[in-house]
Amino acid sequence: MLQTGIKGTGEALVTEELSARAMGSGELPVYATPAMLALVEETAWKSVAPALEPGQGTVGTKLDFSHLAATPLGRKVRCETRLTEIDRRRLVFSAEVWDEAGKIGEGTHERFIVDSEKFLAKADAR
């Protein structure tokens, strides 16, 4: 059952592929903001997926996030999300991301519940 308070946890190892240099968001070999945001989205959707009806999925619609500190290559990062609000099909999550030295990111993320087949048909029709 979908209810507020659902928590999720995700982890990643910061590799060259997840660096700002490789992702094009900067020139330095540190954890890229786009990689951190992807980890937040993945952690959030996976946390609520078991509570959805068959045929439903979620799509990300909004991120309001601060990247607080740089993480060098080779470190592990951990994301924790919590579902804080449900407004019909809109889901709001709080999220925090840490590396081994401390918090590196925090913010909110919104997703919408969709009927997967209808959503894909509408996307294909665009």
Regions found by a protein language model. Name each.
Residues 2-9, 86-93, 99-126:
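C-terminal binding/interaction regions
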Residues 27-35, 92, 114:
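Residues at secondary-structure transition points
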Residues 45-78:
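Hydrophobic beta-strand-centered segment that forms part of the acyl-chain substrate-binding groove
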Residues 1-32:
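Catalytic strand-loop segment that frames the active site of acyl-thioester-processing enzymes
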Residues 14-16, 67, 113:
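Hydrophobic residues in beta-strands and at strand termini
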Residues 65-100:
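Hydrophobic beta-sheet segments that form the core/acyl-binding groove
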